[in-house]
């Protein structure tokens, strides 16, 4: 989608000032926000690309007014409500007022280390061959999807060169669809993944 999360090339937002020696977390609550996101992701009620889509779908003013983990937490709440795991009232009050949903997979304390080490690999097996070859010139699709995409807006329609063939992976643009329902079989559809190099002048002009 063409949202404020895709800020590459946008003007009027000022320079980026990297924080020297930036900590992983700026406040204790951010640790909890990440832990909640990981724990709820283990329920299997959504996948990582659906969660990214939820973050990107926040209203622009709200998105721009939030910190990184505030965005994570708000999107997590929205996903939990959409799956009827909690109610909006429970999110506001911080107290459970309805019985827990039965049959939902949970991440127990003793399984956390193994789950984090295992991760969520996106590589899939295939008998097909890559469509493109190293050094081949390709043009990025000129498109304006309503959902999540990993193709930045500023490269769409531009010509680049294949410099990496990175394997056969789940396609985020496909697996993020239908974010208001649990992932179906189509979420596991794979495509070849390429690294494409674009020249600066191709993207931004001679300046």
For the regions a language model picked out, list residue spans one by one.
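Short, basic/aromatic beta-hairpin or loop at an interaction surface
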Residues: 103-119
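N-terminal intrinsically disordered, low-complexity, charge/repeat-rich segments that act as generic
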Residues: 1-101
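Acidic-enriched, low-complexity/disordered segments with a strong bias for Aspartate over Glutamate
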Residues: 6, 49, 78, 110-113, ...
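Basic/aromatic-rich interaction segments and small domains that mediate binding to polyanionic partners
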Residues: 10-37, 79, 83, 122-137, ...
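Generic detector of short, locally flexible boundary/turn motifs and exposed helical patches
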Residues: 2-3, 41-43, 101-106, 125-129, ...
């Amino acid at each position: 989608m063409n949202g404020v999360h895709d800020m590459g090339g946008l003007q009027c937002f000022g320079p980026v000032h990297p924080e020297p020696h930036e900590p992983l977390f700026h406040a204790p609550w951010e640790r909890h926000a990440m832990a909640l996101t990981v724990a709820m992701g283990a329920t299997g009620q959504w996948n990582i690309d659906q969660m990214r889509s939820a973050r990107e779908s926040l209203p622009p003013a709200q998105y721009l007014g939030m910190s990184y983990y505030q965005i994570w937490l708000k999107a997590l709440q929205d996903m939990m409500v959409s799956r009827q795991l909690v109610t909006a009232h429970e999110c506001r009050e911080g107290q459970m007022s309805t019985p827990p949903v039965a049959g939902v997979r949970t991440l127990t304390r003793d399984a956390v280390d193994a789950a984090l080490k295992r991760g969520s690999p996106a590589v899939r097996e295939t008998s097909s061959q890559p469509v493109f070859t190293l050094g081949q010139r390709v043009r990025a699709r000129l498109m304006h999807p309503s959902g999540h995409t990993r193709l930045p807006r500023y490269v769409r329609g531009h010509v680049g060169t294949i410099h990496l063939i990175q394997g056969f992976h789940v396609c985020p643009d496909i697996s993020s669809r239908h974010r208001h329902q649990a992932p179906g079989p189509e979420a596991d559809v794979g495509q070849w993944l390429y690294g494409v190099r674009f020249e600066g002048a191709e993207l931004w002009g001679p300046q």
